[in-house]
Each structure stands twice: as structure tokens, then as C-alpha cells.
Amino acid sequence: VSAPHFDLGQGEEGRVFVYLGSTHGLSTMGADYILQLPQAGAHFGHSVASAGDVNGDGCSDILIGAPEYDNGQEDEGAVFVYFGSPGGLVTSSYWSAESDDAGSRYGSSVASAGDVNGDGFSDVIVGAPEYYYGSGSIVLYYGSANGLGSSTSLIGSHEDFGYCVSSAGDVNGDGYSDIIV
């Protein structure tokens, strides 16, 4: 559950609440994990999704976008993956990537892509609808035994390409997952 405008004292840093299922359903006592990014205006949690199992350890991972994250450029955006484990969510470390384009709003949309290349690992899609003066782009990161690694970028020629991203399942029945942008 995301609260991208959650104020931790700096203004709209954002917060994500993770609730674990059990034989009794979800806990009503509060979130099992609370994730946050201590940067004013980052809007951590603007987009959230299951990443699938990007590292093949048998546990689902979590994908979180912060489209107004700044690291040298205003609103370049970032995406974060927290890894699941048999002991629960690993919060002490995470994988992250960010845009190289000011104002791109990278991480505005995030989704599991399924297994696009058929290697047995889940892949993820990240949208940056304002990349390159609003043309937009998506980045597809491929899962591996080491987590997310190599990537493929598609740059749009249309306004806000990457505004929404999703897995499409296997549209043509060839055994590979497809995506929707």
C-alpha cells in the first residue's frame, strides 16, 4: 500500500506499507514492513507492484517507483527493488536505478513483465513518461540469479510514452511474456 505524499518532516517523501498474508488473512495491527525514502518531494511509492521473483530464490520481490527523486537532476526519478526471502522482506539493502534525464519522472509506472526472455527469472518494466522532453520511455530490466541486470530501453515518439506499463501475459502463445505500454 503506498502513500507517496506521506510527510516525514521534509515534505512528501513518501512511504510504502507492506502487509503479509497468513492463514488469518491480513493483520489489522498494522503493516509488517514500512519502507521510506528520506528525500523531500521524492514521492516514494507513487507506483508499486510485485516484481515477481527477479533473482530466482523462490520468493516474490517488491518494485517501488519514486518519480520525483533527485540525484543531481531535478525529478529524474528512481526505482527500487526490495527482495523477498524465506525470512521475509530484506529491508537492509535493495537494488535501485535512476534516470539520467532531468524531469523524466522515471518510476512513474512500474510492473512485473513476467519472463520476457524465457530464462526462468521475472523481468520488470519501468516507465518514464516525461523522458526527453515528454516523448517518454520505458526500460525493461532482465532478472538473473544476481537480481536485475541488463536492460533494454525503448524511447517513445509519442507524448507520455511509458505513462502506464503492464505485463500482457503471452499474447501470441510463443512461450515468452509480452508487455503493454
Regions from the language model: what does each represent?
Residues 1-181:
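Conserved beta-strand/short-helix segments
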